Amino acid sequence: ISPLDCMGCGVCVGQCPVGALTMVGQESELPEQDVFNYCVSKVSDKKDMQDLTVKGSQFKQPMLEFSGSCAGCAETSYARLVTQLFGDRMYISNATGCSSIWGGPGATSPYCTDKNGHGPAWCNSLFEDNAEHGFGMYVGQEKIREDLMAKTEQLLAIEWAQPALKEAAQKWLDTKDDGNANAEATKEYVAALQANIATVDELAAVPKFAEHAAELKAKGEKFCDCDACKLACDILDKKDYLSKKSVWIFGGDGWAYDIGFGGVDHVLAQNKNVNVFVFDTEVYSNTGGQASKASNIGQVAQFAAAGKETKKKSLSEIAMSYGYIYVAQVAMGANPAQTIKAITEAEAYNGPSLIIGYSPCEMHSIK
């Protein structure tokens, strides 16, 4: 833990069940920053300790850091966990609301990258069109990926392509719908493509191609122009799209249940591989705690001072009525194991998914 990153909120001290923590002045703890720096720069990921359990998942690097959300905010806990599981290949479309405020404050971002420069690609459009915006992100990258698949199949059909390259290409195609396996296959495929593209200088070293190499060099070309090399170059130009992406649409209950419901319903109905995560605080948290359709009957909130007269909208049952949407409701504080199970199953499901995460909030005024 970095002493420079303490927010001073005191939540850890107040919640420690055995009273082991105390608040002290920052100056006395600053020497511990050297330990933090060592852990960040020198200690590598322990892949053999990382699995999809509550404990194992926490050995993975979080790609959401120091968001500045309210003390005890549950939304950031959910988002952080999702980035730990899929952050290096993750797309996020974020509805306007609390999660866009702590997720994208002016001039900075709490979303970060790993040592390879990979991390969540985050974007915020509007309140009312977030689902459609996220669906567009999915469709765009999927179209590029389909083109890469077609070019890979053309590459496999070329007789003189190197066996090692063909093997890596076939492995990439075979794992295209498996996020974790495809990530490793992508690394091997990119390495094989880079190793098997002939440069003009390498071509010139072969006597029968020397004249052609000179012509290419005169045109300013750097690589061989045979079909295999041209396809390999085209694929490498878009190598960032090779790995299977994990597309997530984040937003609160005011968005998913009320203002953006039409878009949520439409996108889920398309039967495409997108994941919708609703941070359900059961009120409009970002604007001060007004009642939403996610508020419970009898709940006291702004615009419902005498208690809400109607019951909570069953968004999960509406989604389940389609018959092909993965639906889960989670509460990390009550059952963290089920939370991880739901998130990983939603990502693994080759179709639309909806996760509704109960998110305790300061607007609940529970002390």
Tell me the role of every PLM-derived stretch.
Residues 207-234:
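Amphipathic alpha-helical binding modules
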Residues 43-55, 141-145, 179-181, 235-241, ...:
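Structured alpha-helical segments in the cores of large, soluble enzyme domains
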Residues 126-187, 235:
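N-terminal leader/propeptide and maturation segments of large enzyme subunits in energy/redox metabolism
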Residues 1-7, 11-29, 77, 87, ...:
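Iron-sulfur cluster-binding cysteine motifs and their immediate structural context
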Residues 1-8, 26-31, 57-67, 241-245, ...:
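Ferredoxin-like iron-sulfur electron-transfer modules
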Residues 35-49, 111-121, 291-313, 367:
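Acidic, Ser/Thr-rich peripheral helices and adjacent loops at domain boundaries
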Residues 188, 243-248, 258-273, 279, ...:
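Glycine-rich ThDP/TPP pyrophosphate-binding loop and its adjacent helix/strand module
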Residues 56, 64-96, 100-106:
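N-terminal amphipathic, basic-rich helices that act as targeting or association modules
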